[in-house]
Amino acid sequence: MSTVHEILCKLSLEGDHSTPPSAYGSVKAYTNFDAERDALNIETAIKTKGVDEVTIVNILTNRSNAQRQDIAFAYQRRTKKELASALKSALSGHLETVILGLLKTPAQYDASELKASMKGLGTDEDSLIEIICSRTNQELQEINRVYKEMYKTDLEKDIISDTSGDFRKLMVALAKGRRAEDGSVIDYELIDQDARDLYDAGVKRKGTDVPKWISIMTERSVPHLQKVFDRYKSYSPYDMLESIRKEVKGDLENAFLNLVQCIQNKPLYFADRLYDSMKGKGTRDKVLIRIMVSRSEVDMLKIRSEFKRKYGKSLYYYIQQDTKGDYQKALLYLCGGDD
């Protein structure tokens, strides 16, 4: 089996732009796919005394998201029951959370995680920030559409009623998904201007011109901002992350830090979040599950590579140490291998 390093080298040689994001996913479409057979096997597994969790995990973690939708359709046709409801009754705990997450489309999954982050008393700002800061324009536009479909209200409205101040402004601007797309022309003049404007609006003055930071960081393309943050160092004695820590506090600080880390290196950002979810006593399972489910078909190979490079041991190893049972098995399948 090729190591993740070999696969990434091969893909980068082929050129990033010609490579669909799924090429970096750990979960691929299953070759000999038969939705009817899978639906029958899952039905049998659910009916087995004590529930045959191993079969359920084996099937659903080794099929692409599109294939899982086909299985759910075939299951409903067979049994006149929804697969998600049947599995909700059959499973429990963290394993149930993983499996039900895998049955949703990526946009449905993100929409439901966002809704959960804003439901009831208090907001789970951490989850809100992670999803809104890390998704692409296309992903955010699809999330907005699906959110309205699922909850009969706008994502923006819910963000507005659940947040406040500059943090609200930043989240609303990002959630629109209207960032400039990657241009083929590099505008060095604008890079320099933006770097200087970020410095003038923050470290250089007393108080911070937050709207200026928001407009630059939510409107410019990712490759442009990567160059802006590099250029910024020639104006400021601090890099962008250090400047954020000096200039703003609370949820706004957290959001800007997450955003800049996502822009600089998204796979590393997720590797850090995964590490933080497992380090020390106890596991932050919600974060661990969300990243493993949502990135498994996007960039898990890159995340694994960054994780090993920074932390010296593989993501697979950490999951093995920190989880157990069929829940562990499901996460390891989504991880896709040891490095």
UniProtKB/Swiss-Prot annotation:
It is linked to Increased expression of ANXA2 is associated with hepatocellular carcinoma tumor progression. The modification Phosphoserine is found at S26, S184. This is Annexin A2. GO terms for molecular function: cadherin binding involved in cell-cell adhesion; calcium ion binding; calcium-dependent phospholipid binding; calcium-dependent protein binding; cytoskeletal protein binding; identical protein binding; phosphatidylinositol-4,5-bisphosphate binding; phosphatidylserine binding. Heterotetramer containing 2 light chains of S100A10/p11 and 2 heavy chains of ANXA2/p36. Interacts with ATP1B1. Interacts with DYSF. Interacts with COCH. Interacts (via repeat Annexin 1) with PCSK9 (via the C-terminal domain); the interaction inhibits the degradation of LDLR. Interacts with CEACAM1 (via the cytoplasmic domain); this interaction is regulated by phosphorylation of CEACAM1. Interacts with APPL2 and APPL1; targets APPL2 to endosomes and acting in parallel to RAB5A. Interacts with S100A4. May interact with UBAP2. (Microbial infection) Interacts with human cytomegalovirus (HCMV). It holds the Pfam family Annexin. SUPFAM superfamilies: Annexin (SSF47874). The modification N-acetylserine is found at S2. It comes from Homo sapiens (Human).
